[in-house]
Amino acid sequence: MAENLVNTFVTQVIENSDYEELDRIYLTNKVFTLVGEGVADVETDSSELIDLKDQLLQAGVKAGSVGELNEEQDIIGAQLMDLITPRPSVVNRNFWDTYKSNPEQAIADFYAQSKRNDYVKVKAIAQNIAYKAPTKYGDLEITINLSKPEKDPKAIAAAKNAVASDYPKCQLCMENEGYLGRINHPARSNHRVVRFQMEDKEWGFQYSPYAYFNEHSIFFYGKHEPMHISPLTFGRLLTIVEAFPGYFAGSNADLPIVGGSILTHEHYQGGRHTFPMEVAGIKEKVSFDGYSDVEAGIVNWPMSVLRLRSEDKERLIALATKILNCWRGYSDEKAGVLAESDGQPHHTITPIARRKDGKFELDLVLRDNQTSEEYPDGIYHPHKDVQHIKKENIGLIEVMGLAILPPRLKTELKDVEDYLLGQGNQVAPIHQEWADELKAQNPNITAEEVTEVVRQSVADIFARVLEDAGVYKTNSEGLDQFKAFVDFVNLAD
């Protein structure tokens, strides 16, 4: 039975917050302030809070009181959901009061709140295409990212004309908490940050709005300072996995080409997800002089990964620091490895920390951001022949075996499927050579098989992407070159 939309939304706000029935008129007027009184008589069959919020926005657009751009609607939507979101002081007090007796419950409650108030965009994330496919490195995870709405040309034009602002300085800054938002900066009225201390400095813990995996979290420094991989990084990551049970924590590299999309603000990512790289075995055990108590090995992975395990955090930090310092100064001309050129450093590490079976674990992924005439985008970056699938930087998440592919692939891969079935002659020019190869390999392909064939090929290409990004190749020569670096570490003071 249809009910009044505003009244139903207010009822849900009262049920999901500290507001009481006596606050109904006040809340109703808050809603009218945001979406206009023209929605007063709209009815609904829904009782889900986020659905009701979306219907209020649609009704406001229809009534002319809410703008048509996604960005304008997001600003108002976040304010509507802020009505059920406790103040930052309350969020933090609740988190740490619960944490004292049950850290897992504190984390679960904060995650539930972040979904309930639509900060984590559960409905949007559900639109992503996601699957696993076997490769010689184990199952890789493939996602086509459809959760973030593509920019409307009107929004792009509006952003160009918007008044310039450097507040907040970036999308990770603490000042985003409760920020209204604007055309060129996301709405954050319903955003909350849990504060915690590392090294006697304030850090923030939040969830990612457009999560790429379960409980995708961000841990960021309270001040706007650039990313930097250092001995402190290893200690912080291990502190995080100790403080947040069941979570991994990792950092993007701190150099262009091999780094993430945000290098201007020190931050790490984490969450409750087992990535393909984590379950990859050890290809060859190695040892480091003076660290017989630390298990070490080269991981069976397309990128160049050293895995260290120990019960002692400080021993892991010390060895990881030695490896980082050695890698930053290491060159091997035959292997195509160069520490620096013209004063520009090329070497860094993508580190990932876990706590498993009573031990701390660090994966150190060796990175090199050289370019050349043949590979202007990066020698250890997806090469031209695979850029039709992935041309962006290979950051932390991809390093671990989860491909984040662009929205364009949804329609482009469907066109490739139709082409293989003889139902269409058009594929995007960047896919033509690949589509012809698939057609030659599968001349009698059926409609029942075609999606799986294309998806498997995408996974195989992603494995090649990771091989391109690997400094040492996965053949015997590459293994010998990798072990030569281990020997170099052992010779260092």
UniProtKB/Swiss-Prot annotation:
<keyword id="KW-0548">Nucleotidyltransferase</keyword>
<keyword id="KW-0963">Cytoplasm</keyword>
<dbReference type="GO" id="GO:0008108">
    <property type="term" value="F:UDP-glucose:hexose-1-phosphate uridylyltransferase activity"/>
</dbReference>
<keyword id="KW-0299">Galactose metabolism</keyword>
<keyword id="KW-0808">Transferase</keyword>
<dbReference type="InterPro" id="IPR005849">
    <property type="entry name" value="GalP_Utransf_N"/>
</dbReference>
<dbReference type="InterPro" id="IPR000766">
    <property type="entry name" value="GalP_uridyl_Trfase_II"/>
</dbReference>
<comment type="pathway">
    <text>Carbohydrate metabolism; galactose metabolism.</text>
</comment>
<keyword id="KW-0119">Carbohydrate metabolism</keyword>
<dbReference type="GO" id="GO:0006012">
    <property type="term" value="P:galactose metabolic process"/>
</dbReference>
<protein>
    <recommendedName>
        <fullName>Galactose-1-phosphate uridylyltransferase</fullName>
        <ecNumber>2.7.7.12</ecNumber>
    </recommendedName>
</protein>
<dbReference type="Pfam" id="PF02744">
    <property type="entry name" value="GalP_UDP_tr_C"/>
</dbReference>
<dbReference type="GO" id="GO:0005737">
    <property type="term" value="C:cytoplasm"/>
</dbReference>
<dbReference type="InterPro" id="IPR005850">
    <property type="entry name" value="GalP_Utransf_C"/>
</dbReference>
<comment type="similarity">
    <text>Belongs to the galactose-1-phosphate uridylyltransferase type 2 family.</text>
</comment>
<dbReference type="Pfam" id="PF01087">
    <property type="entry name" value="GalP_UDP_transf"/>
</dbReference>
<dbReference type="InterPro" id="IPR023425">
    <property type="entry name" value="GalP_uridyl_Trfase_II_CS"/>
</dbReference>
